[in-house]
Amino acid sequence: MSRRTRRRWELRSLAIVAVFTLLAAACGGGEDLDEGDGGTATDGGDAAQDLSGQTVEVAATWTGAEQERFQMVLDAFAEQTGAEVRFLSAGDDLAAFVGPRIEGGDPPDVAILPQPGVLQSFAEQGDLVPIEDVAGDLVDENLGPGGREVGSYEDELYGVWFKAAQKSTVWYHVPTFEDAGVQTPTTWDEMLEVAGTISDFGVEPFSIGADVGWPLTDLFENVYLRTAGPDMYDQLARHDIPWTDDSVKEALTVMADIFGQPDLIAGGTENALQTDFNGSITQIWASDTPQGAMLLEGDFVGGIITGETDAELGTDADFFDFPSIDGSEPAVVGGGDIAGLLDDTEGGRALIAFLATPDAAEIWAAEGGFISPMTTVDLSAYGDDIGRRAAEALQQAGDAVRYDLSDLQPTEFGATTGQGMWGLMIDFLRNPNDVDGTAEALERAASQAYGE
């Protein structure tokens, strides 16, 4: 990575931090904004075109309930336009899936990019089509300056920020908590005490899906934001401090409170290493004998619970805020998914425009497991109390909201299967005693990705 490119990554990280502060302020919604000149999917925008006989391909990493909920959005678009829409499952690595098709000259029309780092990489390589004329007015109207920044590269709009994520939640199995006689904790130490009680009750408390690694990076980011604070988090995100810094080692040591006790992990460490993310959810809520009682992951877990199990939110599943560590103030790690145009087709342009409207967002919001970054989507649009509470927690964190750190990194360090943060966090789960070695390996991988 050249010095000029590294500087763009640094500026990008700073901008995204500001964006999530804007989202925290706006997430309460409730404002009725005037219609802009860009139109919407239902009042004459591109998505209202007659696209009968055309096929639109959409690639995304969503699976299970998330894929089903997004399919409802695509079905609404198809009904409006007459287009046939094909969802392409990209597995865990979107870049690896669409890369060969781009190189072969046959990319899918639209890709749902799971982090700004992927958008930046694709745009820098010339693989994304600018969408200012497609959805610029809609982005300004419905997402505001923050949404424009998330979807932009070098001041050019390339993506529509469609789905936000509040990743600072801990989901728990309500009946197990009740039967074990424990209350939801507010601090890390209390959570470990609850875990011990649940373990004594006969249930291994923490369910972890670590076959790929990104859930482990989410855990690190939540711990680091609380132990090091927002300012240090920003510095690490920009690689202004090395991964061998004592603050990183402190966060890894805290994580080892769980990783270093395999009897607290559902099925033990080996089971966690073989369990995918959805499996870490269903092994708790899809069985009469739950394997696990707590899952440290984001708001989107709720949608998977209701979509893939018979469990009911509030009765069988609920969440508490990620706990304070050593008196840390409330803080939230956020994320998001961005729709980008890979092929400049009529159908692809129309779908991008549709995804920039509240009509599209409210379809998923009503089903659960979804937070919209649009300021024009009111909290009343959410079909369950869980979604509203997650959105409110994002709002209340204020200036302590930070974007998912791994998502801000060069893709080879922050979002690639088997390497960088994903791979090294898996290695740390295997060997949680090697804090120094893990920090050194993270620094080597980061330096290589940044071209240092």
Segments predicted by a language model, with ranges:
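Conserved N-terminal structural module of periplasmic/extracytoplasmic solute-binding proteins
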Residues: S2-R8, C27-Q120, I363, G437, ...
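Hinge/lid segment of periplasmic solute-binding proteins
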Residues: A47-D50, P116-S168, L192, D318-F319
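Extracytoplasmic/periplasmic substrate-recognition and gating elements
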Residues: D75-A76, F300, T306-I371
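Periplasmic solute-binding protein
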Residues: Q120-G126, G147-T186, V203, G209-L236, ...
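Short, solvent-exposed loop/beta-turn-alpha elements that line the ligand-binding surface or hinge
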Residues: E132-L143, A210, T227-A251, G307-E312, ...
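C-terminal capping/gating helix-and-loop segments adjacent to ligand/active sites or protein-protein/ligand interfaces
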Residues: W161, F370-V377, A391-A446
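Extracytoplasmic ligand-binding clamshell segments of periplasmic binding protein
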Residues: P230-E308
